[in-house]
A protein has these predicted regions:
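Flexible cytoplasmic loops linking transmembrane helices in multi-pass membrane transporters
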Residues: 1-22, 185-296, 301, 461-485
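Glycine-rich segments within core transmembrane alpha-helices of 12-TM secondary carriers
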Residues: 34-35, 89, 93, 104-151, ...
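Small-residue-rich packing faces within the transmembrane alpha-helices of Major Facilitator Superfamily
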Residues: 36, 63-64, 121, 125, ...
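Conserved MFS/SLC helix-loop-helix module at the cytosolic interface between two early adjacent transmembrane helices
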Residues: 37-59
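Helix-breaking motifs and short loop linkers at transmembrane-helix boundaries and internal kinks
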Residues: 50, 71-76, 134-135, 354-355
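C-terminal transmembrane bundle
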Residues: 82, 86, 117, 284-287, ...
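Central mid-sequence intracellular linker of multi-pass
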Residues: 135-224, 428-467
Length: 485
């Protein structure tokens, strides 16, 4: 096998060109660029299309690009196509993780998330087995095309979108359709529709949802509701006197809704979430250098590559399930993160110390480092959503994941230009640094998530109280004038 394919799953391409360090490094970054774009654009795509649509259409796109790649004989064209494949793959993975965190019960979220993620390890072992038995990568890709297409169809038929995300985006039509879909899947569609048509509670809820989508009418309705007392004549005077202020109230309503929707800039602006973003971004970057580095370095280990790759993915499968138990136990998310990051730091330090003395020990600790690192990764996924308020959770996660993708772009250059022994020392330092940084994080296990950033909530409450005081003051003035009349 030539050095060209050090970072590729393909082992039988031949283009007759010579290899160099820069070329090897660039080849290693191509897949990571697709992952980087998938993480960076994820919050935009999710806000526009919803998680269910991403899972369906991107599975189909993933299958289509895999199918196209089979017919390309040029190695470099293939790598460009593979970049798009990784883009679809990362968006699919992100959507799956987000949907799991939003539709699963809080008590069992981490355990179910870990069980679902363990499918990545099973998929890796299945891929290694297929490649070992079939040998020809094209036939392996055909199996991948079929599996991806079937997965997309199953998701389209049997899954519903995240109700939380529909409410955050003020998309009440999608929210209603998802409720109807859930009723249909449980065989209660007729009962649901009859309830909407006949039950006053359902009608009122549906009417409220429709009112929230009409900004221009919301302020007058609020005034009518607030002033529905026995003093009808006084209320008419108050309503007419406040008509001049209605445009201002409408603008405030729109600004308030805009703030509640959330953005990445809000995370950078407010300190209560900014420090979480920075710490998790550093942690994900460090963890990802080890994640991508251990995958690339598997071909340099002693023994059969197929055996080593199978053990690597077996470690992934075990790690996801182990992390679910630890993070959901009394240890909690924060302490679990510290234990796993410190563990892989120690394992990498041992590999650095014995690298030139005993290769068998290096192989053993190599898989131990992989096991503990994947355990930490799985806790990251749950912790990221629980630590951010709901309004900005997708933005925070997307930024953290983007930082992890940057590690995938950088690590091939580090491995190519730095001696392998000292790469393990870098991993060890990263593990210790992350462990120390996590002391500044807060525990999230079993705690309800906040709807909005704390500072924004305080600002909105102040404005609301100020507006109520002004309304009361104006009301007293108008009532006193009315009495004089």
């Amino acid at each position: 096998m030539r050095e060209d394919y050090k970072y590729s799953i393909i082992t039988d391409f031949e283009d007759g060109t010579e290899c160099n360090k820069l070329k090897n490094s660039l080849i290693g970054t191509i897949n990571s660029i697709g992952i980087l774009l998938g993480n960076f654009l994820f919050h935009i795509i999710a806000g526009k299309f919803g998680y269910k649509n991403i899972l369906f259409y991107f599975h189909i796109g993933h299958a289509a690009f895999l199918l196209v790649s089979i017919f390309w004989d040029n190695y470099y064209y293939f790598q460009v196509i593979n970049c798009f494949v990784m883009f679809f793959t990362k968006c699919i993975l992100n959507s799956s993780l987000v949907m799991n965190n939003e539709i699963v019960d809080l008590k069992y979220k981490a355990m179910i998330s870990s069980f679902v993620n363990s499918g990545l390890g099973l998929g890796g072992m299945f891929y290694v087995l297929m490649y070992y038995l079939i040998k020809d990568w094209r036939y392996v890709f055909i199996v991948g095309v079929c599996l991806s297409a079937v997965s997309g169809i199953i998701i389209k038929i049997f899954f519903h979108d995240s109700l939380i995300q529909s409410l955050i985006n003020k998309d009440y039509d999608r929210f209603y359709n998802d409720l109807l879909y859930i009723a249909k899947m449980n065989g209660r569609e007729k009962e649901f529709k009859d309830g909407i048509e006949n039950d006053e509670k359902y009608k009122n809820c549906l009417q409220k949802l429709k009112e929230y989508t009409q900004d221009s009418k919301s302020s007058t309705k609020v005034i009518e509701v607030k002033n529905s007392t026995n003093r009808e004549n006084d209320d008419k005077l108050i309503t007419s006197a406040n008509k001049e202020n209605l445009p201002k109230q409408e603008n405030n309503s729109k600004e308030e809704k805009k703030e509640i929707k959330g953005s990445l800039l809000q995370i950078f602006k407010y300190s209560s979430v900014r420090y979480i973003l920075i710490i998790l971004s550093v942690g994900w970057f460090c963890n990802s250098t080890l994640f991508y580095g251990l995958v690339i370095g598997i071909k340099t280990l002693k023994g059969s590559q197929y055996r080593n790759a199978a053990i690597l993915y077996l470690c992934d499968f075990c790690a996801y399930n182990i992390s679910g138990f630890f993070s959901n136990s009394k240890l909690g998310r924060k302490l679990s993160l510290q234990i796993f990051t410190l563990a892989y730091g120690i394992f990498c330090l041992v590999m650095f110390l014995v690298f030139d003395k005993n290769k068998d020990v290096v192989v053993g600790f190599y898989f131990c480092a992989r096991l503990s690192m994947i355990c930490g990764f799985c806790v990251y996924y749950s912790y990221a959503f629980e630590s951010y308020p709901i309004s900005v959770a997708t933005y925070g996660y997307s930024f953290n994941a983007t930082c992890s993708s940057i590690a995938g772009v950088v690590i091939p250059f580090i491995i190519e230009y730095i001696k392998e022994k000292y790469v393990f020392l870098i991993y060890a330092i990263e593990g210790v640094v992350c462990t120390l940084l996590f002391f500044f994080l807060k525990e999230t296990r079993g705690k309800e998530r906040e709807d909005n950033i704390k500072e924004i909530e305080e600002e909105l409450n102040k404005e609301k109280n100020k507006g109520n005081e002004e309304d009361e003051k104006n009301k007293k003035i108008i009532l006193s004038e009315n009495k004089n009349l």
